Amino acid sequence: MNRPPLPLAAHERLIFALDVPGHDEAIAWVDRLGESVAFYKIGMELLASGEYFHVLDALAKRNKRVFVDLKFFDIPATVAGTIRRLSQWPVSYCTVHGWHAGMLEAAAAANQGDMRLLAVTVLTSMGRPDLAAMGIDREPVDVVVERALAAQAAGIDGVIASGQEAGPIRRATGPAFSIVCPGIRPGGPVGDDQQRTVGVAQALADGADAIVVGRPIRLANDPAAAAAAIQAEIRAAVVPHRD
């Protein structure tokens, strides 16, 4: 079953990538950012700390939305069991790899809560040469749209994909499909490991429901001010068909 996109308020469209090594650092960032961020993505580094679900619980108690970004990829039964358990937690988004239709169908069937499942299409750190090295000699946008349509057909609620592909995905899948875009660079490309990046306004105008921002906030001289500036961009770029 495809769940409709989350009814996000404008300030919830900014998701901060909480890429830190442990619970104390995570909560320090939440306190530092305060009201400027209402949605947090927690990923593999926190999982390795052994404090992952303590952080998830702490975020929920602070009335923050949570995006579990662990990119599950295993046999269908294993992924289904994981999603079934995770859907009992206060999680808004969760990622699964979008490479296997049977696994996606099992994950969708196992989702028993309000959590939205997002299929990983092509990582934003990858370009065409990277795909070619994997035996996929095609443009990233073509692979992304193909996987988005396959995920939608399998009952997955949306995708996580570069903002460069938000428009083609939205045109292919229609309005009732979630698109979350990482690799957002408010000030333009900065020469890091992200290859397929766009700005805030472009991602939202092209159909993104939410954007993920990490280093542009984390490395700023004033992270809360940087997040507030992005929130101002979001408010100025509200897309009518999503509100």
Swiss-Prot record:
Keywords: Decarboxylase, Lyase, Pyrimidine biosynthesis
Single biological process term from Gene Ontology: 'de novo' UMP biosynthetic process
Reactions catalysed: orotidine 5'-phosphate + H(+) = UMP + CO2
UniProt keyword S-adenosyl-L-methionine present: no
SUPFAM superfamilies: Ribulose-phoshate binding barrel
Pathways per UniProt: Pyrimidine metabolism; UMP biosynthesis via de novo pathway; UMP from orotate: step 2/2
Presence of keyword Ribosomal protein: no
Record's protein name: Orotidine 5'-phosphate decarboxylase
Species classification: Bacteria, Pseudomonadati, Pseudomonadota, Gammaproteobacteria, Lysobacterales
